[in-house]
């Protein structure tokens, strides 16, 4: 829910909270050498750590099923009878084969959004634009496009997510003619919450799951494999940095509590005649991660972020939904 969406792309979520969204282009990460991969990861790290504790960060990846008929019209070469049709037919045949093999059936849209509180829309736009320009400059160093979304673009992307193909391209002229708000062009025609675990949204089902117990550093393997699983999913990673002193205090307190828990478990086992220096593998791993995180933050100045990692799974029916969830669990466990 939000209160307003301006043509310049600024969204007023509440009277004093605003957000901007940017479209992130592809980064040729898989095919570059180790040195270039290191530079890419360092750029990401520097950009994320530049955010203060008043700015919310959100990465959204929408793996959208492509309408094959529309896709064919947009990519296949028309024949012109000019002597080059043999080459066009060969290229068209290659693309048709890729479609049949399922290699081009999904398109991933990557969005980065920033949000923060401010006194009014003008100040919020200026503040958020400064953050966006800094990120744009950083991404340009690794040849990645980073484009501010206008209000119309944000509406159309949100409509793609929530309405699928059941919407026409939106323009602000439509508001003038219809007397409606941008929400009318985004919201599904029907929503049903009668099921415990999923939502009926027009002719689709949507279930939201969240990822927990992931490591201190979340690698790209999970996201990459999820994107390659031929599932229509919407991945959303929310993060907000904490002030360094507050984060260090929180980490040390958590480590102390875990060490106390470890001692308690050792004493409990000793009373039953068993003594082990190491106890629960998960607990030992969490203590080691806390140690490593404190060391890293002290040496590098990296920040600690509170994160929420959720996945929206779309399906045509309950059987397909169950199948998709099983695949996600397999990918998460690998």
What label would you give each PLM region?
Residues 1-334:
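Extended, folded cores of ATP/NTP-driven motor/assembly subunits in large transport
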């Amino acid at each position: 829910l939000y209160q307003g969406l301006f043509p310049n792309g600024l969204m007023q979520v509440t009277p004093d909270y605003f957000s901007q969204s940017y479209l992130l282009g592809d980064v040729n990460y898989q095919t570059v050498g180790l040195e270039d991969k290191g530079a890419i990861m360092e750029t990401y790290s520097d950009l994320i750590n530049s955010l203060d504790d008043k700015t919310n960060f959100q990465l959204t990846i929408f793996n959208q099923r492509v309408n094959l008929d529309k896709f064919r019209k947009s990519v296949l070469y028309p024949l012109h009878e000019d002597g080059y049709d043999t080459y066009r037919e060969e290229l068209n045949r290659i693309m048709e084969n890729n479609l049949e093999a399922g290699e081009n059936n999904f398109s991933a849209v990557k969005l980065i959004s920033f949000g923060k509180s401010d006194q009014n829309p003008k100040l919020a736009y200026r503040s958020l634009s400064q953050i966006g320009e800094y990120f744009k400059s950083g991404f340009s160093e690794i040849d990645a496009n980073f484009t501010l979304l206008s209000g119309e673009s944000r509406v159309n992307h949100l409509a793609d997510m929530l309405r699928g193909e059941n919407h026409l391209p939106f323009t602000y002229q439509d508001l003038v003619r219809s007397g409606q708000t941008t929400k009318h062009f985004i919201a599904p025609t029907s929503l049903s919450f009668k099921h415990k675990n999923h939502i009926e949204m027009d002719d689709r089902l949507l279930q939201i799951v969240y990822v927990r117990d992931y490591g201190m550093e979340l690698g790209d393997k999970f996201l990459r494999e999820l994107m390659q699983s031929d599932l229509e999913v919407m991945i959303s990673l929310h993060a907000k940095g904490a002030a360094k002193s507050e984060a260090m205090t929180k980490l040390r307190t958590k480590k102390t509590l875990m060490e106390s828990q470890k001692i308690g478990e050792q004493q409990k086992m000793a009373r039953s005649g068993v003594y082990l220096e190491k106890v629960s593998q998960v607990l030992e791993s969490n203590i080691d991660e806390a140690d490593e995180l404190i060391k890293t933050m002290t040496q590098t100045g990296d920040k600690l972020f509170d994160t929420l990692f959720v996945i929206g799974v779309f399906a045509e029916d309950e059987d397909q939904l169950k199948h998709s969830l099983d695949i996600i669990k397999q990918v998460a466990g690998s």
